[in-house]
Amino acid sequence: MISSNDFRTGVSIELDGSVWRVVEFLHVKPGKGSAFVRTKLKNVQSGSVVERTFRAGETVPQANLEKRVMQHTYKDGDQFVFMDMESYEEASLSQEQIGTRVKYLKEGMEVNVIQWGEQVLEVELPTSVVLEVTQTDPGVKGDTATGGSKPAIVETGAQVMVPLFISEGERIKVDTRNDSYLGRE
């Protein structure tokens, strides 16, 4: 159980038989009446977002989530299959469940898989990945590191803005949180 006073962004709770993650919270103490906590909750299974108010000190069950390191082994239709490297158990997630993170997911990559009981909820990618540039405009002699940027397509199909001196075939490091170029690899 967790008190509404302990809500923070990212805390997972159980409500109405499903797992919800706190996206935003605000502790409110009006001049008249009792304090309360206004929250914005995201359903981890469906992705829906709701606003809900809790009384200060109200307790709700905290979701018991398990984080396991798994390797992305292959794609079967719109299902992405992951395997636990210790127990060799397989778990699959649909492209909808993975969402926009799919653009950085490649076979053989190790990721954190979040489970609630036996149900797989979501995938956490590493904060940065190394990918090969498959398509970009050619660099021209005289392009410098401070001269600007151009779009590049990487091996997974994602588009990343890169410096002008980057050319096709180079391996670059990309931040998966904000799609930014971090450097050459």
Curated annotation (Swiss-Prot):
GO cellular component term of the entry, any: cytoplasm
Main location: cytoplasm
Subcellular localization: Cytoplasm
Gene3D superfamilies: 2.30.30.30, Nucleic acid-binding proteins (2.40.50.140)
Signal peptide range: none
Cited SUPFAM superfamilies: Nucleic acid-binding proteins, Translation proteins SH3-like domain
Keyword Cytoplasm among UniProt keywords: yes
A matching Pfam family: EFP
Pathway where this protein functions: Protein biosynthesis; polypeptide chain elongation
Membrane-traversing stretches: none
Family: Belongs to the elongation factor P family.
Reported function: Involved in peptide bond synthesis. Stimulates efficient translation and peptide-bond synthesis on native or reconstituted 70S ribosomes in vitro. Probably functions indirectly by altering the affinity of the ribosome for aminoacyl-tRNA, thus increasing their reactivity as acceptors for peptidyl transferase.
Protein name as it appears in the record: Elongation factor P
Biological source species: Acaryochloris marina (strain MBIC 11017)
Taxonomic lineage of the native organism: Bacteria, Bacillati, Cyanobacteriota, Cyanophyceae, Acaryochloridales
